[in-house]
Regions:
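Core subunits and conserved enzymes of cellular information-processing
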Residues: 2-240
Length: 240
């Protein structure tokens, strides 16, 4: 019996992302994905059992600054995006949308969802956030509008230095986790669960969310991030 083939993730420049077609569906998936991703970030925070490394930093900064967590997410996203310049990275449409919308979605959810009390409810919230994050990340990746600013930073360093993505990711995420914890961010069960399960969760849903693009675009391509060179979007934190 022939196996059903799923659409592939493609290396696209920002211009190719626009020319790849199916824009209404892709834009819808992009913003639904980012909204779910931001909501999941907020639920992790409300659960109080620890967040993803970058969110530990976001939360830690929010305890020291008169700014909402969403505002900090947006501002830090722009700072990370500036680091793309010496790496000669090119942001995609999804990269810009990520910077602008993720923090707004997180703030709206934090306004709607009160702090969660009781260990059983907190664990249930973490589990729900992992699923929501996985769906959101898969929709975002499947729209094929470029990596998030933090993943683009990692792939840019990889392309310029030749260091492994695993090493770069580990160094960056351990660093932001440590800084965030020192600033007052929460590290706990949710942090460990995110590290272990967000990759499999996103990968599971990705099989249904990758949008089929035009064949003419499929035959060529250089991914947003580094013109003319492949720049694989990591599945684990593609919306980071």
């Amino acid at each position: 019996m022939a196996q059903t083939s799923h659409p592939k993730l493609l290396p696209l420049t920002p211009l190719q992302q626009v020319r790849a077609g199916r824009l209404p569906l892709r834009f819808m998936n992009l913003f639904i994905g980012l909204t779910l991703f931001g909501a999941a970030m907020a639920i992790f925070i409300r659960a109080g059992l620890g967040q993803a490394p970058w969110d530990v930093l976001h939360y830690g900064l929010s305890t020291r600054m008169p700014l909402s967590i969403g505002t900090i997410i947006i501002l830090l996203g722009f700072v990370v995006l500036l680091l793309w310049i010496p790496l000669k990275q090119w942001p995609g449409l999804g990269t810009i949308a990520n910077v602008l919308w993720l923090g707004i979605a997180a703030d709206i959810t934090l306004w709607l969802v009160p702090p969660i009390e009781g260990l059983a409810w907190q664990i249930a919230a973490v589990a729900a956030a992992l699923v929501i994050n996985g769906i959101g990340g898969a929709l975002y990746i499947g729209a094929q509008f470029g990596p998030g600013p933090r993943d683009g930073l990692m792939t840019g360093i990889h392309l310029r230095t030749g260091l492994s993505m695993r090493l770069i990711r580990t160094v960056i995420e351990v660093s932001v986790l440590a800084i965030g914890w020192l600033l007052g961010g929460i590290v706990g069960l949710g942090t460990v669960a995110y590290a272990l399960l967000i990759g499999p969760s996103t990968q599971f849903f990705l099989r249904w969310t990758v949008v089929e693009l035009r064949p003419a675009v499929r035959a060529r391509g250089a991914r947003a991030g580094a013109p003319g060179r492949p720049d694989a979007t990591p599945v684990e934190h593609a919306s980071s």
